[in-house]
Structures are given as structure tokens and as C-alpha cells.
Amino acid sequence: MEINREEFSEVVVNIGRVTKVVKGGRRFRFNALVVVGNKNGLVGFGLGKAKEVPDAIKKAIDDAFKNIIKVNIKGTTIAHDIEHKYNASRILLKPASEGTGVIAGGSTRPVIELAGIKDILTKSLGSNNPYNVVRATIDALARIKA
């Protein structure tokens, strides 16, 4: 599948800071969770880690382009209900009638919007760790049958 990066939008979902305490003080490192999508059925996510935030975001974008999936969209919504679990996060996706909009919160919304889905109902249950929620959402979208 040939991917033209100019067609894709990216959203930084989460930036985390980790601290390593050393003799001379604290050493900070950052990680970034990024979702990319062309709003036409292709979406992916990536995680990048670096000593500076912009470097972590750049690495995350590069990683996201390696993990792109195709989403089967039926009109403006999805074909059927789906529930998926990743670690302690559970996600429910339900098709919605036209004009409903994207009813999604937290880390689920950017994935749904960048996939190009216009009408959907979602519910996130269990852990709301951004990485797990994004991963559960993308896995669920990948399992939708046309």
C-alpha cells in the first residue's frame, strides 16, 4: 500500500514525562503517543521516546506510518457493533444514524475522526490509559467486517 504522507493529519494524543534520578539530579525523557489518519479509512498510531518533546513526536509519527490499518466504513458510520479489549481497557463501538456525529471521549475521539468516521457511538470502559484505549480502538476498527 503506497502512502502519501501529505494526505495524512496527525494528532498528539498524549505526552508523558519520565524521570531518572541520578547522582547529579534528575534526567527527564519524554514519550509521545500520536495518531495519524487520512480521514478516508486509513488510520494508525505510534509511540516515540526521546530526550526532547519534538524529537519524541517526530519518532511517534514515523512509528505511526508503520502501523497503518484500513478501516471498513459503511457510509458515514461502521457496519456493525463491536467490542474489543486490550489489557485493562475495553471499548464499545456502535454504528449511529446520519447526523449523530462522533460521540467519543478521551483518546478514542482522534482515532475515530482521523479514520474518517462521521457518525458513531463509543464507550470506553475499564482503564483509561491513553495507549491502551488507542490500541483497543484501532484493533476494534481493524476487526470490522465490510
From Swiss-Prot:
Coiled-coil region list: none
Keywords tagged on the record: Ribonucleoprotein, Ribosomal protein, RNA-binding, rRNA-binding
InterPro entries given in the database record: Ribosomal_Su5_D2-typ_SF, Ribosomal_uS5, Ribosomal_uS5_bac-type, Ribosomal_uS5_C, Ribosomal_uS5_N, Ribosomal_uS5_N_CS, Ribsml_uS5_D2-typ_fold_subgr
Domain S5 DRBM per the UniProt entry, residue ranges: 8-71
Highest taxon listed in the record's lineage: Bacteria
Family matches, as PROSITE patterns: RIBOSOMAL_S5 (PS00585), S5_DSRBD (PS50881)
Function as written in the Swiss-Prot or TrEMBL entry: With S4 and S12 plays an important role in translational accuracy.
Protein name: Small ribosomal subunit protein uS5
Gene it is expressed from: rpsE
